[in-house]
């Protein structure tokens, strides 16, 4: 009978260039989520994993433990999550996924967004949504009710994964992208069946794709060639389309969609309040590079949701599919529905 895992044994395994099994990873993350791991043990684990490179089995084990310890979210899983890993080299990219989620909901897609406060970025989804008037202090039951009432809700990681608080200080002090950046998009407590996920670190794309593939989930996983965890407008992006256990790769040039190039500076935010103000202007219909990149990423979410219902869409060119979805997203903004959706959502969380 194998001996029970210990922290020295697991960290030694990683230092020696070997990897953890699913069960060892589950044990370690369970220790973290229950507050039974010391900061030194957690820091050692995170750095050793970062140095050795995480595997799909390790991420699956960590994810299983996080969801096992999560508070339940009683919601229809036929929904969409648009999310990014964070950890891009700029550390200050506009909260594109948050506003794209509002636009997708305004276009009629049920959205269950999952996120947290900034750890490896200046402004996390929770930070900017709070600035936009969304109350994150509501109960898990109310989170589900808000979805049924408005078509969009937010699963604040600190609420549904209270064990994450045990890792917050270590993550903040390390100041680097860690396995938690990969875990976040995989640990939505509602387990929505469609995901649009941006990954900043190219070496971690196979992890994200591999986990979605083993789950039989539907997802568009993407990365800008400029290193941001979004579909970018500064140049090309790469997309990994996951459907029914198969993966199809695409190269996307936004020029194919009629979207002009933008400098990276146009996609960067300056802080929580400034990002919130940019989002308000985008939802009000202001043209420019911020609008362009938001519509493109909203389109990815809309396409992921449609792919969930119709897997044969993989046979169509990605550029054509996204061009159609950009038009739908633009209409949701220009009609005023997206701005109204944000106000409706925020009001529901405060009711």
Curated annotation (Swiss-Prot):
Q: Name one GO cellular component term.
A: cytosol
| Source organism (scientific name) | Clavibacter michiganensis subsp. michiganensis (strain NCPPB 382)
Residue ranges spanning the membrane: these are none
Subunit composition and interactions = Homodimer.
The residues listed in the UniProt record as binding anthranilate 1, with positions renumbered to this chain, are 84, 116
Q: What is this protein called?
A: Anthranilate phosphoribosyltransferase
UniProt KW keywords: Amino-acid biosynthesis, Aromatic amino acid biosynthesis, Glycosyltransferase, Magnesium, Metal-binding, Transferase, Tryptophan biosynthesis
Q: How does the cofactor attach, per the note?
A: Binds 2 magnesium ions per monomer.
Q: Which cofactor does it need?
A: Mg(2+)
Q: What's the family?
A: Belongs to the anthranilate phosphoribosyltransferase family.
Q: What chemistry does it catalyse, as a reaction equation?
A: N-(5-phospho-beta-D-ribosyl)anthranilate + diphosphate = 5-phospho-alpha-D-ribose 1-diphosphate + anthranilate
The GO biological-process annotations, alphabetized, read as:
L-tryptophan biosynthetic process
Gene that encodes the chain: trpD
Q: In which pathway does it act?
A: Amino-acid biosynthesis; L-tryptophan biosynthesis; L-tryptophan from chorismate: step 2/5
